[in-house]
Amino acid sequence: MNHYDVLVEGAGPAGATAAYYLAKQGKKVALVDRAKFPREKACGGGLCVHIEEFDHIISNWDDFLESKCFRGIVYGPDFTPVDYVSEKPFFYNIRRLKFDNTLVKYAVAEGATLIEGVAVKSFEVNEDNVVTKLRNGKELTSDVIIGAGGSFDMVSRRIREIENMPMKWKDEDIATALYFEVEVGREYMDRVYGKERVSMAHVKYQNLDGYGWSFSKDTVLNVGIGCPRSIIKKLKKDNPKWDERQYLLDYV
């Protein structure tokens, strides 16, 4: 049975970054994720400026940076806009497929062991170690386990159990997001979205209790919608023919 100082469940940006810093300090780290990288993630792909605090990321911008956003427009339900322009970037545009995979590579380059394509089934905290069982039947031990797999990872479930919190998330507490990215070319992006790469958000489009977005990359446009799962279920109950994918296309 392989033993690690730390096992990180989830190799997204949070998990990969934790694995990177731990491995850099000489820790033996296992980075476990149910997906195989590179993989897509439903997301607008905008990084807040606090990303500048991570030296290993900003020193390698060329590995994944798509564009810098200097302007944002937020539209209300009736399309009334609030326009904001900044002299400095107020967020950075990336594509999750490339960004997440790059962060995993940084962690592996520092010595972390990537275990991909298999999910954590369960784990048990003992006095001297943590025993983690994977879905493929393998067992790993570690001194510490970190949960970075999102709302449904095994660590977050255990915390909810210990704290006597509900074991199941309510539909109104979980968001459903749909997006797509379309290649439109740099000439189009420069002409329509400008060098400031204006990005837009639309609150309560057609009274949907959520928002839509349009984030402009280098040559790609990322468009999506997001809202609580409870809203999606209600819309489908009221109209069985309602389809969220068609809704996204209509929004575009």
Regions found by a protein language model. Name each.
Residues 106-252:
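Predominantly flavin-linked oxidoreductase catalytic cores and closely associated redox partners
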Residues 23-42:
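Glycine-rich FAD pyrophosphate-binding loop
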Residues 14, 37, 152:
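Conserved Rossmann-like nucleotide-cofactor binding loop
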Residues 49-102:
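A conserved beta-strand/loop capping segment in the N-terminal third of enzymes
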Residues 1-14:
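Beta1/beta-strand and adjacent pyrophosphate-binding region of the FAD-binding site
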Residues 4, 26, 142-143:
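Short, well-ordered alpha-helix to beta-strand connector turns
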